[in-house]
């Protein structure tokens, strides 16, 4: 029987791999963007609609799925999610009608919706507060490493299999990973039951457990709206880059498919570094005495403002090397915000409400994210460049930083159902 430490490491590994495959699949359409437009005669606006179909479905699936994840648990929710989205991904390579492809993107969005709320729930079960930042940083690095390896890897698949074969193959990879997840992963409750052990007391207490309430009650809390509005800027900027960054380098700077692939990969590598830095920085700040929520709040605001600044500079820069450097810095900072936003989820609500709260946050983020591809496509078609699109993104990110600053506060004390010491500590504390 594996030790608790080995299962913690296995949890991080599984969630990391699932995150990588998740982002490979959602990146596939942006990588095949130009090829599909030429092959099927799809306009930039139609492509924007197709790209946004995923994020709209993803966003509106969040609210009902959050409470369901809290009831089903991360193992069943995440495994079922993998199967549904992998089937949708594989089927995308088998159809040609614009409406059929939009429908499959909708199914992909529904299938992927439970992934990160489920991951946040799994981390909240396996990791204590003072070690959760680093764990979250490593898991959320997958949201950048997936897009980082996507351009060269998916381009390689396209060269040898065509864009249709690329979609089928990536779908099959997801189904294999789903089988491994069901075969090997155990929740902490399952592990404790099988080993007959009692869960050790956390060295730093978690938010106290609360009576089960409807997820809609979370909308009455100020912090819910802070996370909802704040995450809008994070996902708007991420989704603009995820869906249009390859097209930007091809259209604005005349890079071919191979050069574009490597440049985009470099930008996402910087994003992955940002998520790991965010996790380690938050844990280090807490170890030095900063309040848990304060450490998260500082990092998420810093990331949004840094991302906004460098994106704004890109809008007025024409040199390709300078644009690559600036976009790498943008991805570094905005992914600091992305990882930290999920650490906030695990900080201000107890474990049994993590998926519900995280789903509401994701709903807000992907409402904005669903607008980004369409608005960017419209802006490019009307102006002939990406400058306006980048300026809009910078403004949205800056507004979200203000929302985090103004609305995110230490949560009100709740009656603890555990020990009184845990409750007192939790009041003081209250993380892709």
At which residue positions do the language-model features occur?
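Helix-breaking motifs and short loop linkers at transmembrane-helix boundaries and internal kinks
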Residues: 41, 73, 94-100, 128, ...
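Helix-loop-helix hairpin linking two adjacent transmembrane segments in secondary transporters
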Residues: 139-189
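A late C-terminal transmembrane helix in Major Facilitator Superfamily
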Residues: 346-383
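Juxtamembrane intracellular "pre-TM" segments in multi-pass secondary transporters
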Residues: 2-4, 192-228, 252, 423-426
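Conserved MFS/SLC helix-loop-helix module at the cytosolic interface between two early adjacent transmembrane helices
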Residues: 60-96
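Extracytoplasmic gate region of multi-pass secondary transporters
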Residues: 29-30, 221-276, 338, 342
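Structural signature of the two symmetry-related core transmembrane helices
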Residues: 76-90, 294-311
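Cytoplasmic helix-loop-helix junction between adjacent transmembrane helices
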Residues: 104-143
